[in-house]
């Protein structure tokens, strides 16, 4: 085993462990001494609380061992101990623990990291609020003078507020008309996913929010009375002790609807109130710098969701589940609207004795009297002179009837529609209109009647304006559900169909050209293709049922609830046409009329598919029947094509550098192609939480997109594991939403010619090719790599962690690399501190480029300074390298690897260690820093804290995994030479629980699962 020491450096001793999910950095860059002191002060408070809770909850001897283990994680604590290393002391202490103490240690360190995460979120929130204050108070006269020697805006990738971006644009003389055109067509869509599911239980997350709230109260007041301070501290200790006694692990595998409920929390607690604030901040900043520009609609930023609708590889997502998900979402929105309208009714106490009322509102009240005579009889006397309250009473009744209708639909299911809704007479025709709201426009029209009446009397109501903004953004649906399914499911279903129909040639036997010809022919006929009353295979029946459910969903909820169908592993044009044909069969697509209520979205994932994508789309754009079914957008009413780019599988296939470059090139080629056909393109970025899956700072990633590819439109996945860190607190949510929006505005309005520099593109193509070759030589061509990964990482135990409704592998029973999903692939490497998918291959590629021509190093430095795309790549690699711990990684290998494969595994480890050294050397030379993350002192402070504290969890995990995997031998917690073996035996369930708790703790420390 490689032992660490305080003097160790380079590959064997990493410099840091990032405090945020693989590159998600706080706003402050570089940091200030004041911020550092604030962090240190708050850190002391949290550490003191943690120690107090451990001493209260654990037996004295055990608590002292845990505190000693924490102390030993700091190398300076061992100075003067006869040269004994930190690792040796930690191993010695772990060896002396029984399983109950090991479990307590895993829980204690997990609690510690989660408290630190809460602390840092609060500091990031405070930093964002501080950044808003100067822009609000600063006017043109006091603004800092424009610096002509500053880097061009196209090269600036620091996050910016609305005020900062609009000021920069004005100083660059960007015309108001150009800004207004962009804002009018601004279309930002954030899509929440369940996978990788956040490892923290929903119950624990609730307790974390309570702790965060108490910490904010304790730290927000500079001079609290002593009693109040002591009371807040007592409440904090009480809440953390309750947290300590709460089970961190899911007792049962969460269902899809559990994941839906967890996701809806962020909308209920944060986003419903945050989104109107986002628009107000945009409007305020815009009015200062571009006073003549019309404000954008509230729906410039909306939400989607895959939770309950992503069925790719998840058999638990059935048509019934998707139907109930839609009902859950609508239920939440109706409950929120009911609360808002009740509050509004309390506020709008305007009497007709003292204010005029617009005639349209009075006319609507007369119509409502006919529709709802019971309400009129109940409320008319009370609100006889208060028309706004009376109107809002009618609105409340309709909302409550809509909620009842929604409950009926949820209970009945998609195949059994509820009883016909109650109706009311309209213009003397009985039963002409439903009493409940059948569309969001009806609700919005009622609210606008009230607003227009207020405006006509020179009154305004911010609460009403806020509600109208929320209605524009969320509708009744809350978020649009994207259906996602793997391409072969459709081709298999059509193959079974054509076999049943006894076509001369079954679909599965056709070549691609034959498939396309047959699909286009069928699309042009009105003849039904799928016969009724046929007993299909289970998979085919499910595929057909999804489209039937979609049709029913749109009929009841409107198109907004679900209008995108994502086809994962798209390879050819037939993959898209298959979905169109199945949609046509059920009435979602009508080629004869040129109408479609479903947008077919290909997802290109592998490098080969990314390279093939332009040719595939070119053929489809030239096909009239396909092009005519694209929806129209924008002032020019261009046909819109949404297209998704996959980061996860392309990285798993070819490595980090190659994947990112191929995606970059594909975007340019696809945008050029779409423009040549007069098609508007909306790129959907399937970004994960980790660097290897496209994660990292969203603002940096958006600014790194090729110039001209956004044009105000972007769609991005927000992975389950990062939702809490981005949307768990109101100001953090606003910070994330504001920086995403400003990045889209900046990228769309400021032309970046650097993407078109031929020499830079040629260099990137070379290094991407070299990186891919080196990555594939290890990951795909080395016959021992799969065994190495399965033995040296906790991948098998990860599959037993009850955090997700989706299986870890695509195919049951398969144990090869291709069957493993990208998320557990990354999770396994992260837990064992290799983090290989996020950096391997980069060092060799860059080193070979510099070795061929030493002057290329200067070019690489210029790229890092001037090109946002290259700076993003290096920044992500730098952040990932700071998390790598080769000492600990080698301990995983030597302790968990099969002794018979030791030589092969040592060879693999040497390849990894050598590549780490090359990558570290080149990154430091390119950035000009002497150590990783050297440009941000505050980040380093947090990084060093996590780096020294997470180590014991790694040793604990290895000890528990060894026992778990070899119960016959029952090895001790550690095998230090000369120590007697621990003969205690434990059940498999006890050992598995301990191992899973270490997974929890390390994920909390790394703030990342997959």
UniProtKB/Swiss-Prot annotation:
Record-annotated active site: 195, 652
Gene3D superfamilies referenced in this protein's UniProt entry, alphabetically: Phosphoenolpyruvate/pyruvate domain (1.20.1440.90)
Composition-biased stretches (Polar residues): 1-18
A GO MF label: phosphoenolpyruvate carboxylase activity
GO BP annotation list: carbon fixation; oxaloacetate metabolic process; tricarboxylic acid cycle
Keyword Magnesium: yes
Pfam family, any one: PEPcase
EC number: 4.1.1.31
GO cellular component terms, A-Z: cytosol
Cofactor dependence: Mg(2+)
Top class in the EC scheme: lyase
Alphabetical list of InterPro entries matching this protein: PEP_COase (IPR021135), PEP_COase_bac/pln-type (IPR022805), PEP_COase_Lys_AS (IPR018129), PEPCASE_His_AS (IPR033129), Pyrv/PenolPyrv_kinase-like_dom (IPR015813)
Keyword Nucleotide-binding: no
Region span, Disordered: 1-36, 132-154, 967-986
Top-level taxon of origin: Bacteria
NCBIfam families xrefs: PRK00009.1 (NF000584)
Role according to the record: Forms oxaloacetate, a four-carbon dicarboxylic acid source for the tricarboxylic acid cycle.
Family, per entry: Belongs to the PEPCase type 1 family.
Protein's recorded name: Phosphoenolpyruvate carboxylase
Organism of provenance: Parasynechococcus marenigrum (strain WH8102)
